[in-house]
Amino acid sequence: MTHAASRPGITRRQLLSRSVAAGASFIVGAGFVAATDGAWAMETTHLKPRSMATLIQMARDIYPHDQLADEYYAIAMRGYDSAEAAPAMEAGVAALDAAAEGRGEGSYLDTLWERDRVDILRGMERSVFFQTVRGGLVTGLYNQPEVWPAFGYEGESFSKGGYIARGFDDIAWL
């Protein structure tokens, strides 16, 4: 009698886990971007999922904040997933990938080292694509109230009586 462990093939556990994973890939659909840690996900309608993932990485490289999750960068990039913006964004991502390939990196998203990605961005920082993404990030990222605590910003003060009434008149720090 042969012991089950000595048989070639896969175990029941492997079969079940692979079946579930394969089934999930059909349910999720094509226009889907998910975090590597599984903490968030978003669907794209006009951009390719890989292009959106590249834009998110680009956003993180332009304004790097280790204390912020990719989810907030994804929210900031969501506006570029429109019929009007998608062609320019796809062309910009193609230019990023071409620059990375020219350096022997594969694609921008596959470039492992941040300093290499930043060098790629520096090479195109005068482009309309780069300026559009960078400019949109200023409001798209920093206008999210959920990220304010990470920077110690308490938000606007007018609706709370102004800054003076909230302890900002203490000049002991001078």
Where are each of the predicted segments found?
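Short amphipathic alpha-helical segments enriched in leucine
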Residues: 20, 59-63, 97
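N-terminal secretory signal peptides
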Residues: 1-10
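C-terminal segment of N-terminal export signals and the immediately downstream linker at the start
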Residues: 9-14, 27-63
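Mature-region segments of soluble proteins
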Residues: 53-57, 71-174
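Post-signal-peptide N-terminal segment of Sec-exported extracytoplasmic proteins
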Residues: 65-71
